[in-house]
Amino acid sequence: MVANKDKATKRKIPAVDDAVKVSTANGKQQTKLKEPVDDESASDYYESDEENLFASIDNGNDEDSTDSEGEGEESDDEEVQEFESADSDFEDESGKDDEEEAEDEEDDADEEDADSADDVNSDSSPEPEEEESDDELEFEEDLEEPEQPKAIQKVIVGRQKKSVEATAEDEDEEDDEETRDLLEAAQKEDEKLGEIDAALGIAPAKTRGVGIFPPEAKSRFKGGKNQDEYAAGDTSDEEDIRNTVGNIPMHWYDEYKHIGYDWEGNRLIKPAKTDAIDDFLKKMEDPNFWRTVKDPQTGQNVVLTDEDIGLIKRIMAGKNPDEQYSDYEPWIEWFTSEVEKMPIRNIPDHKRSFLPSKSEKQKVGRLVHALKMGWIKTRAETERLAALSKGPKFYMIWESDHGKEEMRRIHDHVVAPKRPLPGHAESYNPPPEYLFNEQELAEWNSHEEEPWKRKLHYVPQKFNSLREVPYYDKYIRERFLRCLDLYLCPRGKRTRVTVGPEYLIPKLPSPKDLQPFPTLQNLIYKGHTDMIRSVSIEPKGEYLVTGSDDQTVKIWEVSTARCIRTIPTGDVVRSVAWCPNSKISLIAVASGKRVLLINPQVGDSLLVKKTDDLLAEAPKSETVDNERITTAVQWVDFTEEERKSGVRIVINHFKEIKQVTWHGRGDYFATVMPEAANRSVLIHQLSKRRSQFPFSKSKGLIQCVLFHPVKPCLFVATQRHVRVYDLVKQELLKKLFPSCKWISSMAIHPKGDNLLVATYEKKMMWFDLDLSTRPYQQLKLHHSAIRNVAFHLRYPLFASASDDRSVIVSHGMVYNDLLQNPLIVPLRRLEHHERVNDFGAFDVVFHPTQPWLFSSGADNTVRLYT
């Protein structure tokens, strides 16, 4: 076995002896192997690759590698000394008996088996075992033949075996010399490995092909063939990056046992450090040592592929990194070098090409003007000024006494106002109309003591020629007064403030800061067969009532959108209103010419029974209504069918009713009949079952009325104005001017100090009743007529419904401080209704406690926005 090793050593050592040193342009030496003669073996010969990479690639052990050449030489010398000491030990122990020699041979055999097992393990892959092709096996045999580090290792083993034999002393000396030569060559190769690291700039940032390879990486290059990474089991480049610390300096982990963290947050322990002997043995044993680099991010050794080595060689040779790129492609002559005898365009020169350039003339003119003004200095003037600046400077002794004052006056100089130019009256031969008559002359003379009241400070005169004009006797006086004006009258500058258009726009807060407000459609209440004109909600917010053109009133459950009850009315329902008093359950419905007071029979049964008991018997009234009231309205009894449907009181009117609205306490409610002229508004009292006309005259076509939430006031909106009446004093408090042609509806703030008026002209007017009778702000948010507006009882929100299918929610904050104006910010446009016959959304109402909004439209639906 020793003889076989000696033969292998003698066969592989010439591969090292064949290396020659070639001096490069930068003065350094590189080792270069002799190229094999055979062309076929040259294609599989990798010793040139090994030598080139040995010249520059580091072996990956940053802890043992040194930057300076001197340190590297010392470490190699120490390794040589250690091996010499080992040889001496072997020579001293040559007297061992045969049994110890047999044990040594068995240990060597075990070590060789372990090495072969390591080689097998290093070449193995986690893929399923498959039969290798003949080409791959032949290629592996070719790769194993020129392995230089293995030869060095076998030389060392041969030396150890021969040291046991006492008769091989001469051969040991020759082996020592060969080992020293090999160590010196390896030392120079290590020095050149650092140069490639510096040239490549190996850093944590990965480059293409150079990075951390998974354990399956070897299987992809098995047999020297580059297999598909997905076939090899590598399906993600990001999963290979096990260290998740990022692109940071890795020297931060020098003091720790770990080098980073993996994807699961576990520490990545640094690999065990190896000493110089282990590194040298690895260099001798590992066939891939020359192409192994160390990953600074994980501390592991990475074997470079053939593609990476080819890329490094091309970069070191100064070539293009792309193999497919050719520097010597055939030149394509896009533009011919031959001179064409006939031009492509033979247009005659334009006339302006023969004329001097006007722009150059202007430029020369500007330069001449700058020379005249002294802005541009000639070379002689520039040199003269430079000489003066370098020379001594002289100053006046008393210059500081008046310098600041003079500079201030020059800096703040204000031009004196010019005198007015003379007019026609000051001419020596003015037209006749400019001459004074006797009356004007007497008036001018009468202001002798008050000359500032005269229109002219002189009397116009007429002369036939300029020679007849006498000396102006007031010339000296006028010059004197002019000097007094310049001397005594102060002059000042007026600073003009430039205000941009962006400063005129008020700065509004972001809608995100004004939440909560309705943003999304939550529920749709379907059941009506015609457009829904009005909607109202119970004071507790559990039930909803709607009135439609299908002559029905429906009661819904808010949380489930389920229709609980349907009440037929016999006519079109134009308005519904739930009584705001939570102690009774009652709904007022305006259907045609009747007002129906309906008990919905939902909610608390005790409350329903209490309402029926309250409305069971009509109170006896001692007062007798006049004929004007009895002909307009009658409180009548209901039928049996109406009683079963929940109708408790019926009030007949003589005209069609457009609106019904409740007072805040729930005892009074008002109805509006626009076609009834001076009897358009009626106020009904539920407890006494009597009605009255608040107005004896009508000053316009009344559209809607509204009770004040706190005070005994009534808001009456005609087509163009809004009047506020005091019901106790029975007088007009104020008249509001919305500056519109037709008012559609209005809503009052819960505090009662602000009023919102909607018009059919796409505008909303916000009135501050304490501020003015004119609108505080006009909102033009909709594209069509606005049907209704509403305020929220608790949140600073208001909404508007329009025929453009949209419901706009806005923020309206009213402050307790009377000096601070209300804050109005549009928030969200909700367009979910469908347009039917040019009608969109009809009515809106807020939930009493939640920031929710209900809207009814012409598409027969009610929608809930939350």
Swiss-Prot record:
It is found in: Nucleus, Nucleolus; Nucleus, Nucleoplasm. Residues 37-52, 60-146, 167-179 have a biased composition (Acidic residues). Keywords: Nucleus, Repeat, Ribosome biogenesis, rRNA processing, WD repeat. GO terms for biological process: maturation of 5.8S rRNA from tricistronic rRNA transcript (SSU-rRNA, 5.8S rRNA, LSU-rRNA); maturation of LSU-rRNA from tricistronic rRNA transcript (SSU-rRNA, 5.8S rRNA, LSU-rRNA). InterPro entries: BOP1/Erb1 (IPR028598), BOP1_N_dom (IPR012953), WD40/YVTN_repeat-like_dom_sf (IPR015943), WD40_repeat_CS (IPR019775), WD40_repeat_dom_sf (IPR036322), WD40_rpt (IPR001680). One of its GO terms (cellular component) is PeBoW complex. Required for maturation of ribosomal RNAs and formation of the large ribosomal subunit. Belongs to the WD repeat BOP1/ERB1 family. This is Ribosome biogenesis protein BOP1 homolog. It comes from Aedes aegypti.
